[in-house]
Design a protein with these regions (language model features):
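C-terminal segment of classical bacterial N-terminal signal peptides
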Residues: 13-22
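Sec-dependent signal peptide recognition
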Residues: 2-10, 14
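A residue-level marker of the well-folded mature domains of exported/periplasmic proteins
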Residues: 3-5, 21-126
Length: 126
């Protein structure tokens, strides 16, 4: 949970600072599972708690079936179309999400991967 709090705080600080009565930022967590799994239920709670701490409007987009990469890709593309301020996602395929991540970055939407080792990074770098 501490990593998620730091992650969201970092995303929030990346944007201009102003005061508003409603949530200033919208973040989506696009995951490859649902929250029926105890691990992802804990991640969901941590994500929600972190969002509450930075007063962000956050959604965790889960799948109707565990591991459905096409549904996950649709959720990622939907997040981009919504113009969210940042996306956290798991990358479960080496190439299927590349175009969507590139599209998000081109639109100025930061994308952070979670629970995913980068093939060019150190093992356990997630």
């Amino acid at each position: 949970m501490k990593k998620i709090t730091i992650l969201l705080a970092s995303l929030a600080m990346a944007f201009s600072v102003s005061t508003a009565s409603k949530a200033e930022y919208k973040f989506n967590f696009v995951m490859h599972s649902d929250t029926n799994n105890a691990f992802w239920a804990a991640v969901h709670k941590g994500f929600k708690d972190a969002c509450d701490q930075v007063d962000a409007d956050c959604q965790m987009l889960t799948l109707s079936g565990d591991g459905d990469q096409q549904e996950q890709l649709q959720n990622l593309e939907s997040s981009i179309a919504q113009g969210v301020d940042g996306i956290v996602t798991t990358i479960t395929h080496p190439t299927i999400f590349d175009a969507a991540v590139d599209e998000a970055l081109a639109a100025g939407i930061p994308v952070i991967t979670a629970n995913t080792d980068h093939p060019g990074g150190a093992t356990g770098s997630n």
